[in-house]
Every structure is written in C-alpha cells, then in structure tokens.
Amino acid sequence: MFSSSAKIVKPNGEKPDEFESGISQALLELEMNSDLKAQLRELNITAAKEIEVGGGRKAIIIFVPVPQLKSFQKIQVRLVRELEKKFSGKHVVFIAQRRILPKPTRKSRTKNKQKRPRSRTLTAVHDAILEDLVFPSEIVGKRIRVKLDGSRLIKVHLDKAQQNNVEHKVETFSGVYKKLTGKDVNFEFPEFQL
C-alpha cells in the first residue's frame, strides 16, 4: 500500500506535517475507491492548511502545483464534494502554489539578470489566487473602493449563473483571501442591465 505522503510533494524535500498527511491520505483513499482514479493518479499537492474563517468555522486550503491546476479544476467540483464529506463539512478550496518575486530595486537589480515575469508580480498572483478561489464560478467584474482612511475594499462580482453553487461559500472565500493576502474582499452576484 502507498504511504500517506504519496500524494504530497513538498518543496525542498520538507516533511509534510500531520494535517497535510491527513489530506494526502484522504486523496489516496479517493484515488483507490472512486471513479476519479484515472485523473487523480497523476496529481499531487504541495501543501495544505486549515484556517478559521469567522463564525467558528474552518476551511481547508489545498495548494497544488501550477502546471496541475487545470487538471485539478476538471475534477474539482466532485473532489471538493468528496473531501467535504470526509472532513465533516469544512469548506475545501484549491489554490495553485505561486511565487511572488520581490520588486527589483536599485540594490537588488544586479543580482537577478532576468526580468521579473508579470505572472510573478504581487498583483498578478493575488488576482490569480482570487480566480482559483471562486472556481467553478467566474469573476465578471471588480470594483475597488478606497475609503477616506486609505483602506481598500475589493468588491468582486461573480457570475450570477453559479450563484446557487457558491453563494454559501462566499464568507469562506473572503476569510481565505484575507488570510492569504491581507486584503478585504466582498463577493456579490450583480444583476446585469444592458
């Protein structure tokens, strides 16, 4: 039988902690005895975290390698349903493990000869996290409200068609995003008038 850490590949060869091993084990069990076997066999995760998202509820964030994100998203709806059953209704979200490279300053410019790609900038990574978070629904608009004290509130407009599927999770999404990026975000399902 495979070990519980078979589905988790940590960067720099670190050892997965107990919680990550539990998630890995759950994925293995799903792979063994569900019809997701073929899709899950090729996939692994890089990390997992459990966080509080207000109201005493907990959410599980599972980080996956960027190249495998598309494959995860093909089966994400079913995978999330199964994992939520296993972990007694905690919300589960999948997010790609992305790196943010620091902004080149005068001092640090000489060290890295390569230009920093757009996909490694803070803005791009934070936007991408938001998109991963709300999958399978799509972001159809964004408004950033800057208050007088300088604080920002991001209003994210989600696809009305997916409202029934994700509406019960929007608080979780806000909590997870705040935890990962420190930014406040509100989710809305606007009616579109042309």
Swiss-Prot record:
This is Small ribosomal subunit protein eS7. It is found in: Cytoplasm, Cytoskeleton, Microtubule organizing center, Centrosome; Cytoplasm; Nucleus, Nucleolus. Keywords: Acetylation, Cytoplasm, Cytoskeleton, Diamond-Blackfan anemia, Isopeptide bond, Nucleus, Ribonucleoprotein, Ribosomal protein, Ubl conjugation. Disulfide bonds: none annotated. It comes from Homo sapiens (Human). It is linked to Diamond-Blackfan anemia 8: A form of Diamond-Blackfan anemia, a congenital non-regenerative hypoplastic anemia that usually presents early in infancy. Diamond-Blackfan anemia is characterized by a moderate to severe macrocytic anemia, erythroblastopenia, and an increased risk of malignancy. 30 to 40% of Diamond-Blackfan anemia patients present with short stature and congenital anomalies, the most frequent being craniofacial (Pierre-Robin syndrome and cleft palate), thumb and urogenital anomalies. One of its GO terms (biological process) is translation. Component of the small ribosomal subunit. Part of the small subunit (SSU) processome, composed of more than 70 proteins and the RNA chaperone small nucleolar RNA (snoRNA) U3. Binds IPO9 with high affinity. Interacts with NEK6. Interacts with DESI2. Interacts with IPO5, IPO7 and KPNB1; these interactions may be involved in RPS7 nuclear import for the assembly of ribosomal subunits. The modification N6-acetyllysine is found at K74. One of its GO terms (molecular function) is protein kinase binding. Belongs to the eukaryotic ribosomal protein eS7 family. There is a cross-link at K70, K74 (Glycyl lysine isopeptide (Lys-Gly) (interchain with G-Cter in SUMO2)). Phosphorylated by NEK6. GO terms for cellular component: centrosome; cytoplasm; cytosol; cytosolic ribosome; cytosolic small ribosomal subunit; endoplasmic reticulum; focal adhesion; membrane. Component of the small ribosomal subunit. The ribosome is a large ribonucleoprotein complex responsible for the synthesis of proteins in the cell. Required for rRNA maturation. Part of the small subunit (SSU) processome, first precursor of the small eukaryotic ribosomal subunit. InterPro entries: Ribosomal_eS7, Ribosomal_eS7_CS. Coiled coil: none annotated. The modification N-acetylmethionine is found at M1. The keyword Membrane does not apply. PANTHER family: 40S RIBOSOMAL PROTEIN S7, SMALL RIBOSOMAL SUBUNIT PROTEIN ES7.
